[in-house]
Amino acid sequence: MGKVIIWYGGVLPPCKIREIDYDLIIIARSVYEKEITNDLVNKYGVDESKIVVYQPQTHGITWEDERIVMLRKCISLMKERDIRGDMAEVGVYTGEFAKLFNRYYPDRKLYLFDTFEGFDSERDAVNAVDIDNFKDTSIDIVLNKMKNPKNCIVRKGYFPDTAYGIDGDFALVSLDCDLYNPILAGLEFFYPKLVHGGYIFVHDFGSYHYEDVKKAVFEFCGRNNAIIFPLTDICLSIVVSK
């Protein structure tokens, strides 16, 4: 164990690591685990064996159990009430959430909207550190997780540009695209098509990192008198229903 305990009422800059006798360095969340670890090791000479990730993200999205439980409960109610309609996710990434849609409703159409290339530095207003996020995916990675990939309709590109020729009703939708424009466009596109008893999940509503998600939701709900229900997952997702 370290011999010195330092009580400090503020935030220490990373360069102070060299001056501190410590046992472990704990990365609170895994969002930037690779980047932080790289800086600690290569810039500040930290022994990688002393780096611990408090909330490792090594098993898909199991750290968001509340969101998954809510999805299962909503699907259970939909089946009990025989709620019919297609399904969609905007912002699929590697398909961890969308695969649950396909697992519980393998016979229904599932539209998958994503660039499958991460953020665009010119088009998407994101922090520079986010530019390389979400690039480690592909259509094959997503479809290989699906119980019935034949009912998955992939729309590669920018939403809502890729939402052409879709006229059916929707029962279950997930919006997980982190940015103001696609979140607002997703609500504007899917809410009128949402059947009574259907649900729209919006991720990152309470995220401090993607604050424009909340802005887009409030703007849409204010214009349409839509009601939201908050979840207790780590990013404070919300559900919109009719």
What are these regions (language model features)?
Residues 21-26, 49-51, 109-110:
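Hydrophobic beta-strand segments of well-ordered beta-sheets in folded domains
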Residues 1-31:
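A solvent-exposed beta-alpha-beta segment
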Residues 74-76:
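Pre-Walker A adenine-sensing motif
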Residues 53-65, 72, 81-242:
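S-adenosylmethionine/decaboxylated-SAM
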Residues 31-32, 94:
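Gly/Ser/Thr-rich loops at beta-strand to alpha-helix junctions
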Residues 5, 41-52, 224-225:
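Structural alpha-beta junctions
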Residues 2-7, 32-37, 121, 210:
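Short, charged/polar "capping" segments at the starts of alpha-helices
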Residues 35-43, 155:
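Structural/interface elements that position substrates and couple domains in central-metabolism enzymes
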